[in-house]
Each structure stands twice: as structure tokens, then as C-alpha cells.
Amino acid sequence: MEQHLKSIPLQDDTKKKGILSFFQNTTTVKSNKFLTKEKDVITLDDPKEDVSGPMIETVKQETMKSINKECADEMKTTPKKANAEDKLLCYKNSPIQSTKYDRNTNKQVPNGNIIAIETKSRSSSPCSKRELSSSKKEEAKREKELKKQQRAEEKHRKELLRQEEKKKKELKVEEERQRRAELKKQKEEEKRRKEEARLEAKRRKEEERLKKEEEIRLKEEAKERAQSRIGNFFKKLSDSNTPVVEKSDYEKFFLPFYAKDGVRVSNKWKLTKVELEGSKRKIDDELLNSKDKTSSDDLLNWLQSRRLPRGHKIKRKAVDVLQQMPLKEKTDDELQSLLAQVPHKYIKFYENVRPPFIGTYSMDFTLPPNDPFSTKGTGFNYDYDSDVEWVNEEEEGEVDNLESGEEEEEEEDDEDVPSEGEFDGFLDSEENSDLDGLPCAKRKFVGPLIPTICLKSNFENLSEENKRYLQQLKAEVIIETDGPIDPFKEPKTSSLPSKRSNSDLQAQTASQSQSPEKKQKAMITDPMDLLRLFDGVQDSTFSLGTVTEIAQKNLPQYNKQTIKNTIKEYAIRSSGKGDLPRKWVIKDAQNWENLRANANMPTPSL
């Protein structure tokens, strides 16, 4: 402390007031004097003058009080920068007001300029300042930490309030959103119910309308069917002025379906337009309203539950009915009712000529998915074509007329008109009923037939009845000729007279003159159309009706009856012996080639 006092000069500062400003008379330090250790006094003007006496103690105490007070004030404002040295500098630089004392009388002398400060009292001041400064610092530090803690608590409290306010606001927004969603859902549900009610009413109206239309259509079909039956007895004159309505390709290839008597068209999977729209809208609503995975799974399960199983379980089999048939306590009506419970099959294909299969089928088996055409364990044989053995080529003319929409000419049955010499054999058998004077009676066989061999050497030992029977089975020569027959030469024309008598010729001439003139059949005469017909018929394995329909698609200007007559006239169907299929073949191949040569058409590749 004393060293600092030696090194600090006294500076002149007239603007700042010192700690001794409470004295009345103030003097400004004009000289820069230093504090000396030997005298321990502050010399201002006259170094010889000094102050002593009891007033020095008073001045010292008052000075220390002022210094302590000023230091305390400065510590409150700037606690980090205040220290003992600064206080001394403040004390040094402040203007000093002094009072001069008389040495001898020890009285105060006005306007004095010497102040004496004892070294002992001055040396005790820095320690108290340091302690005061450290205590102030600690107190200030505690106050600072306390304020910091208070600020942190205040901040935490505000944060909690803010979060609570935010949660309340979010809860309010969520409640508002749920309320709006519930209101929207109620509106959609109400709208859906109204839409379903509207669709249901519309569907009922549509069903009633379709029912009325179906009744009207059935009445019209029955009326047209009756008119067509009546119209078949009369020949309708063709009107050349009637405009021909050309059909589109779709109408030519896809003919309208005609339900026969006893046939009902199934509409199990048929939905009206209104029902289809309602079903689609229902599924769309389920998909749109499902927000979580659970709803989606429920929808998938619902769709799978709507899938119908394949096939139907057979409740009663034909074997069970057959086992109950020998029982005597069952009546015919009961057996018929049991038989009606067995499922029946009606199988018909477009290409087949023979009637469709109608019967029971109760075999229970499952086809393998990797080989659905397998016939193992089924008893089926797809290689066998039962249609080949069917020879009857009669067609249902009524159905064909209804499908084609044209009124065809009535086909005359050529087989009803006896041909020339057709009944000669029957007349001969009647005339020659007695062979060798013995009646020819039909033999009746009772029991199974046993094959036997009869040699010619034993012919005389047979009975007369067996002789007559074997006489009918003997071989006869058709053409009597001498020597071998050369197959590479033309046979000679025989000039033998006709076996038929003149009376037979006269009777035939008379019968022809009496019979009415035979009606000529309508056939195709255009060479180009004939060539197109022959190309489609040659080597075809279809029946006559199917070939006629196929040819009519290529020749729509002719009706079915005309095409059928032309096919019968120019083509014949092979017998199909063995494994060979029955094919249509043109009778006169040379005529076919001549037509092709005249038309300059290339030969089709077979």
C-alpha cells in the first residue's frame, strides 16, 4: 500500500470533486508532490508546515468514512472493477480542502494547506477494504445466482404454461375435427340410404318393365310360331319390289338365340344396369371408408365369401335308385320321384348331328389342375366320335327358319316318290311267292342262333325247308362272260333284250302320264357361286346342316334350302368305314375342273 502511494502522482483535476468536498474552503492541487515515507504526510504548498494535534484524528476519521462510503457505492455499481487501489486513486485525484492549524496553540488556522495523516491509521484501511470487497463479491455472486435461478424457474413455469395451452388448443382442434368427421359421415350415410332407396325403387320399376316386355315377347313369339306353321302350308309369292335389307357381318356370324320348347335361359348371373351400378357403388364405399388395415381385411374376407363354390354336391346317385328298384314295396310313382332327384345332363354340341345326350350323371371325381384333359378314372374316350355312326341327316327346319329370319321353301321329300323300278323286286316276290310250288314263309327263330356249316355234298340230305332257305343264299353270276375279265378294256355293250315285258313298259308309261309334273328344286346355277360352294364342301367332315350354314355365310344371297338342294345334287358323303371320317366329295370332279377353267380360278390346295 505504501509503495503504491509513493508511485502515484497527484494530478490536477478541476472537473471532478474529491472526497473532502464537504469542507467550505477548497483548494486545487497545483503542484505534483509525492507522498514520502519519512514524514508520512501529504505536502501541498509549504513542506515546512505540518498539522498536529487532536484535529488530525478527526480529519482522519471523517476521511475514512467518506472513502468507505464512496467505495461501497462504487462496489454496488461496478463490483468487479472496484478495489483498494482505485479507491486510493479516487482519494488522491479528488480536490483537497484543508484547514491550517497553529503548531503552538494547536488551533485551527483558516485557509491552511497541510493535512497530516498518521502511518498507522493509514495502513489499516486496505485490509478492511479487501474484506469488504470479497464479501461484496460473494454477496453479489449469490444474488446473481439467485436471480439466475429465479429466471430459470420463471422460464420453466412459462414453458409449462405454454405447453398446457398448446395441448388445450390441439385437443380443441381434434374435437372439432372429429365432430366435423362425424357430421360428414352422418351426411354420407343419409345420402347412401337415400341413394339405395332410389336405386331399389328404380330396380323394381326396371324388373316390372322387363317382366312386361318378356310377356309381350313370349306372346309375339307364340303368335309368330303359329303363323309360321300355318304359312308352311301355303306358298308365298316372292315380291321382287321388296327392298333387300343387308345384314352386318356381326348379324351374319352371330345369329340370335332361339329357346326351344322346354328350354329356359338361365339369368342367374345377369344383373340389370341399376343393380350393377348399386353393387359397384357399395364396394367403392367400403374401399373409401376403410382407413385401417382391419377394415381392409374385413373387405377381403367379404369378397372371398361372395365367391361361389365350383360344382354342386350330388345328394343322390343313380346307383342308390337302382338298388331300391327291386324292392316290391316301392311303387312306380315313388321310383319316378327318386329318379327325378338324380341330376340329369343335357349335352349338345354345335357340330353334332345326332340328338343330344340326355341322362343321369352322378360320378364324383376331380380333374387334376396340371392335366385337365386327363381321362384317367373317368371312363371318357375323346378319340371316339359317336357322331360318325349317325346317318340321319334330317334337320329341324322350323328352328333354322327362325334363326335365319327367312321364309324358306318347303322341301319336298324325294324318298316318298317311288323311283323307276323301285318296287319291282317286291312285285316279283309277290308274284313268285311260291318257289317250286312251295310257299315261302318267314322263319321265326326262338332262342340264340348257332352258326353251322353245311357242305354241298350233304345238300341232298337236308330237309325241304332248309333247301329252300339255302337256295335263297346261293351265289349267282351277274354278268355271264367267257374267259377272264380284263380290267383295262372297256366292257362290250350287250344287245340283249330287256327282261321287262311290253305290258310293264305300257304300265310305266301310263303311270307317268297320270302322275302330275314333278316340281323342280331351286338350286344355284351361277358358276362363280358354284365354285365357292364346291370349295367349302369338298373334304368337309361336318353334317349337312352345318355345311349349309357355313356355305350360307359365304353366299348370303341364297337361302338354306337352295344351298342344301345344290349340295345334295353335286356332292355325296362317304360312308367313313374304319377309322376314316365321313367326308363330303364332289360327284363329278371333271365338271368342277371345267367350271374352274372357264372362270380362270386357281385350283385350291388341299
UniProtKB/Swiss-Prot annotation:
UniProtKB keywords: Chaperone, Chromatin regulator, Coiled coil, DNA damage, DNA repair, DNA replication, Nucleus, Phosphoprotein
Q: Main localization of the protein?
A: nucleus
Q: Which domain of life is it from?
A: Eukaryota
| Phosphoserine sites (modified residues) | S94
User: Any idea where this protein resides?
Assistant: Nucleus
GO cellular component terms, alphabetically, are: CAF-1 complex; chromatin; chromosome, centromeric region; nucleosome; nucleus
Per the record, residues carrying Phosphothreonine are T78, T509
List where Polar residues composition bias occurs: 493-515
Work out whether the entry's keyword set contains Chaperone.
yes
Additional remarks = Present with 1590 molecules/cell in log phase SD medium.
Q: Which family does it belong to?
A: Belongs to the RLF2 family.
Q: What is this protein called?
A: Chromatin assembly factor 1 subunit A
State the organism of origin.
Saccharomyces cerevisiae (strain ATCC 204508 / S288c)
Q: What is the lineage of its organism?
A: Eukaryota, Fungi, Dikarya, Ascomycota, Saccharomycotina
